[in-house]
């Protein structure tokens, strides 16, 4: 029987695994908990869908940009002060979100919330590297990922309940309560896990050198870009599904969470399939299979819309397929875009995350800007993203020399 992963001596008394899991859950909860409220926000503030979408798009932009600086800051100053500062900012931003009297204030508060949320996610990954032996770190991340999967499954359901019974501000009150509980636990129980602080971690010359190494490598782009486009394909639905389902296709708000959770379950299924496909077919072919599913999902969605289908029941299966494809594409992208850089692993991971968020920001902005009260824009964008993933997954890895094939 496999022994459970244990923290290295000196950290075993701390609830590290629990904190790691909850830190990682903060990102999906920060988004999924208020998705059902997006159409209501457009009504309350009397603004178009494109303006409301900025509460999502600028969140991912802030999250993506923060990834490039939070890691080096924690390397220099330690994990505790960075995550305490980040959670404090997240708490204040959540309260500001809930108290917002204008859409502009809400957008600004969501941007601040993203900065605080990013600190928790980055520090969780750093703690795994600090406090667990290499042979245990994979098991820790795998187990934590199982916990994290509950957030996008249950978050939209809870968010729909809160919207129906308490209104849109309730989601941000829950965010604030979660941040308060985490802050108390961090201050009371989280030790400093960075025992080898690097005073040069934030020097611009070193950062620039590492960025050049990673961004100049075709190995990085061969897998990071298809993965980022795949994330963009699911962000099509994260940013646009609530408007289309609730406002266009007349889905009751209370049902939205269950429809979205069904779609998210596709991602969990995809990750299971990915492990089996990779063991049998290897990296490149597995990515091609996942990208083919991405294209199929988008093409089926567009075909149904062009055929005149106008019922909310057509969207959850397409979401399931799209997120299932991402469940195949994402693990391949994540591992193969970072593993070629053992000396710049943190930089590669940060750049990969920033690229994901950049694509999500662009997609979210397009989804919001093209919303016209019909299903057509969402279907066209979904099919376009599937096509881009399909092309990128074939063209870019094929350009890697044979000796570098993973």
Regions inferred by a protein language model and the residue ranges of each:
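A late C-terminal transmembrane helix in Major Facilitator Superfamily
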Residues: 334-372, 382
């Amino acid at each position: 029987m496999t022994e459970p992963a244990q923290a290295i001596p000196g950290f075993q008394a701390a609830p590290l695994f629990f904190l790691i899991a909850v830190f990682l859950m903060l990102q999906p909860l920060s988004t999924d908990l208020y998705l059902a409220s997006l159409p209501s926000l457009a009504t309350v503030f009397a603004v178009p869908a494109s303006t409301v979408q900025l509460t999502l798009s600028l969140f991912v932009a802030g999250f993506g940009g923060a990834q490039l600086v939070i890691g080096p800051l924690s390397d220099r100053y330690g994990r505790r002060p960075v995550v305490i500062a980040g959670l404090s900012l997240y708490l204040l931003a959540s309260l500001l979100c809930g108290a917002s009297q204008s859409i502009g204030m809400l957008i600004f508060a969501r941007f601040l919330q993203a900065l605080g949320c990013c600190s928790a996610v980055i520090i969780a990954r750093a703690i795994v590297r600090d406090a667990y032996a290499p042979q245990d770190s994979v098991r820790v991340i795998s187990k934590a990922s199982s916990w994290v999967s509950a957030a996008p499954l249950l978050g939209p359901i809870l968010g729909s309940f809160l919207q129906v019974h308490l209104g849109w501000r309730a989601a941000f009150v829950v965010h604030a309560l979660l941040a308060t509980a985490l802050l108390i636990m961090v201050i009371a129980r989280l030790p400093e896990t960075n025992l080898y602080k690097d005073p040069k971690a934030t020097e611009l010359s070193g950062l620039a050198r590492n960025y050049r190494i990673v961004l100049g490598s075709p190995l990085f782009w061969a897998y990071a870009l298809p993965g980022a486009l795949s994330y963009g394909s699911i962000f099509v639905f994260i940013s646009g599904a609530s408007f289309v389902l609730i406002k266009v296709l007349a889905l009751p708000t209370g049902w939205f969470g269950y429809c979205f959770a069904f779609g998210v379950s596709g991602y969990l299924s995809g990750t299971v399939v990915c492990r089996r496909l990779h063991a049998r077919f290897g990296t490149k072919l597995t990515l091609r299979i996942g990208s083919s599913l991405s294209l199929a999902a988008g093409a089926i969605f567009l075909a149904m819309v062009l055929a005149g289908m106008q019922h909310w029941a057509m969207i959850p299966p397409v979401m399931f397929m799209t997120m299932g494809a991402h469940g195949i594409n994402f693990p391949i992208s994540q591992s193969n875009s970072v593993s070629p850089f053992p000396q710049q692993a943190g930089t590669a991971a940060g750049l990969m995350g920033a690229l994901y968020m950049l694509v999500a920001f662009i997609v979210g902005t397009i989804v919001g800007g093209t919303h016209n009260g019909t299903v057509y824009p969402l279907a066209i964008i979904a099919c376009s993203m599937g096509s881009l993933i399909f092309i990128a997954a074939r063209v870019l890895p094929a350009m890697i020399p044979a000796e570098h094939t993973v």
